[in-house]
Amino acid sequence: MTLTESSRKGSALAQFQQIYRWQLKRSRLISILCLGLTFLCFSVVHLCKSVRSYHDYFDNPSELGENVSHAYLLKQFAGTIQANLMTGMATILIPLLLVFLVVSAIQTFQYMHKRRSVDLFHALPIRRTPLLLGNMAAIGTVLGGVAVLNLLLCGAVDMAMGAEYSICWLLGQLGYLLLLLAASLCGTVFLLVACGTVSGAVIAGILLTVGWPLLVTCGAAIIRGSLPGSQLVASGAVLTALTPYLALFVPYSVGGEMFLSAALFGDPTYDSSGSLGGNVVTVWLILWWVLVTAVLLAGCILAYRKRKSEAAENNFSYPGLRIVIRFIISGAVGLGCALFFGNLSGSNVVFYLTAVLASGLTHVITQVVWVREVRELPRSLLYYAALAVAMAVFFVGLATGGLGYVNRIPAEGDVDYIRVDLPGYHFDDSKETYLYSRTRSLTVDTVLPEDEDVMYKDDVTSFSVEPKLQKAKSIQTVQALHQTILS
């Protein structure tokens, strides 16, 4: 009775502030460790590279050739520094921050997965919502502070040395990083709340992070192979729409989806506007992650309020999460195995049979190993039946023309141009030869104006040439050919 009365006296804001300050003090050691590691491994390394680049470009300009303009050197130096910064963020800073995020979240919320600890924490004179949000805010403060300090330090030193990349660009990179870190934190805490054990939450995060991109990639590859003329390539935003951990790397990836698709399925089709290497962070992408972060935060609050103490040391406090993740990973493995063995055998029967068997086997394995409820296996087959129906609808839709996609000929007014994809010449069977043969280049001698910011005034310039048909008569001819093929 005493605990109940005392819990009503303090406001939610006051309780939040107490938990926030207590958690910051409690985690100061790991926070200092995170700051020290990121400073040493990211900032110091980047600044050393910047000093080395400055020395190469400005202290010994004669090594780059004669008649090199200072403006050209400054431009090249800025580009090198910017590329080094993005590389360091993708390979050092973001992975370290993610490791700190996961470790801190598990350390902070592990009391929810121990029956004695959860009873003790829930008996404290404090409401659940301030307890949850105070801990999350403390972790987010450390993450954001470390990211801001490192990036602003590197940016300030780079600009002092003459790097001309925009401060708006740097703030944009920082803003995207902070937003996705917030989404990753909310997603991690949601998994910890929804699962009854730490191991269950970790496995759920791994399955979701691997399963969704694999499902999207395999689905896009099947659509390309089934619908003539389709050049669908899953964009980085779609591949990482449900995985904020991977979405952190989208602006820093270079052609990742293209090479992944070619390596897995042998499909050389590549569209720069739809690849992971587009490096485009659109307003819609930002709005999407703002919405996802808000939904995950609300889900954390609602789930934690209704979470029973008896859920500790159980597999799941909310079984609905395992149904969704199992659906995704079973479908991804089924489609992936179907593509592999279908291409290997060249048989449609093998393709469909493998899709059914692989997805069913994955469903059984996740039920037995991850969920650990063998007695519930017969009942869980109802959810696998839903997956089988969804896959059947997908395959039937593709077999019947993709809802009219195959038979649709765009109107002449809707066509800006038609790209001609020439077959090229093959010298051997290597991927490099194929990619080289698909590249058309034109080399010309170019004399540029005196005020042009280039290394040499007289230069040989190479242009990438892509055959296009833009005249009305050419478009009409191709449309007639398309209609003839359909007929």
Predicted segment positions?
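Aromatic- and glycine-rich beta-strand/loop motifs that create alpha-glucan
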Residues: 1-35
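Terminal transmembrane helical anchor/hairpin motif
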Residues: 2-6, 12, 48-82, 214-303, ...
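Secretory targeting signals
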Residues: 83, 137-201, 205, 213, ...
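Long, hydrophobic alpha-helical segments
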Residues: 88-117
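Central hydrophobic cores of alpha-helical transmembrane segments
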Residues: 199-212, 356, 379-391
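Internal/C-terminal transmembrane anchor helices
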Residues: 326-333, 364-406
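Function-determining sites in protein domains
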Residues: 380-387, 397-487
